[in-house]
Amino acid sequence: MGTMGKAFYSVGFWIRETGQALDRLGCRLQGKNHFREQLSRHRTLMNVFDKTPNVDKGAFVAPNASLSGDVHVGRGSSIWYGCVLRGDANSISVGAGTNIQDNALVHVAKTNLSGKVLPTVIGDNVTIGHSAVLHGCTVEDEAYIGTSATVLDGAHVEKHAMVASGALVRQNTRIPSGEVWGGNPAKFLRKVTEEERVFFSSSAVEYSNLAQAHATENAKNLDEAEFKKLLNKKNARDTEYDSVLDDLTLPENVPKAA
C-alpha cells in the first residue's frame, strides 16, 4: 500500500471512529432511558492495510479464531477454536486438508537474528496440535506437530516427519523425512513407524470430516438453533420412563415364549 493508500485508510478509520463516538454520546444524552449493549468487535478475518486473508470456501475457520493479514487457507483445511494466524509482517500459507488445532499460534518473521524475511509455509494434510507455536518456518506435507510444540524461524520439517509434544525446534533446524524429534532443544529420537505414518494421513482426514460438522452447526442462525433446542426437548424422554424401560428389558423380566 502506497502513501496515498495509507492516507485514505487513516481518514476512513478516523471517520468510523468519530461516528461511533457520536453514537455513544447520543445514547448518554438520553439519560436513564438509554441502553448500552456490549458487542464484541472480534473479527475472524481481518485485513491489515491491503493484506486480506484468503480462505477457500471448503475450509472451516472457527468463529473465535483470528486470521489477519496475508493468510491463505486451502480447501478442506480447518482452523480450530482460539487459533491465531497473524500474517501482518509476512505471508502464511496453509495447504489443503491441514488441521490447526485449538489455541495454536502461527506467525511470521520480518526480522530475526539471521536478518532474513521469513514467511510460514504449511503443506497439505498436516496436523498441528493444540497450543503449538509456528514462527517463520516450513512444514511439509503430512508432517505432524505435537501438542504445545514450538517451531522457530527458519526451521524446516520435512514430509512425514514428527515433532513430539512440548518440543522446541530451534532456528534453522532441519528435521529429515521420517524422523521423530523431541525435547528442548529438539533432537533426533527415532524413526517414524509405519503405523505413525498411516496415522498422520488418517488424522488429517478425520479432522477434515469433523470440521464439516462444526461448520454446519456454526452456520445456523439463532432461529434454527432455538428450533433445534425445542425439537430436542420435545423428543426427550423422561428419565423415569427410561428407568422403567430398563427394568422391563432386564433378562429376568423378559417374558418367555410359549
Swiss-Prot record:
Subcellular location: Mitochondrion membrane
First-level EC class: lyase
Gene Ontology MF terms in the entry: carbonate dehydratase activity; metal ion binding
UniProt keyword Transit peptide present: yes
GO cellular component, one term: mitochondrial membrane
Residues at which Zn(2+) binds: H107, H130, H135
Disulfide bonds: none
Keywords, in A-Z order: Lyase, Membrane, Metal-binding, Mitochondrion, Transit peptide, Zinc
Cofactor section: Zn(2+)
Binding, substrate: R86, G87, D88, Q101, D102, N209
Membrane topology type: Peripheral membrane protein
EC number in record: 4.2.1.-
BP term (GO), one: photorespiration
Transit peptide, residues from-to: 1-43
PANTHER family tied to this protein: DYNACTIN SUBUNIT P25, GAMMA CARBONIC ANHYDRASE 3, MITOCHONDRIAL
Subunit note: Homotrimer. Component of the oxidoreductase respiratory chain complex I; element of the extra matrix-exposed domain, which is attached to the membrane arm of this complex.
Function: Enzyme involved in the catabolism of H(2)CO(3) but that does not mediates the reversible hydration of carbon dioxide. Mediates complex I assembly in mitochondria and respiration.
Annotated family: Belongs to the gamma-class carbonic anhydrase family.
Protein name: Gamma carbonic anhydrase 3, mitochondrial
The gene coding this protein: GAMMACA3
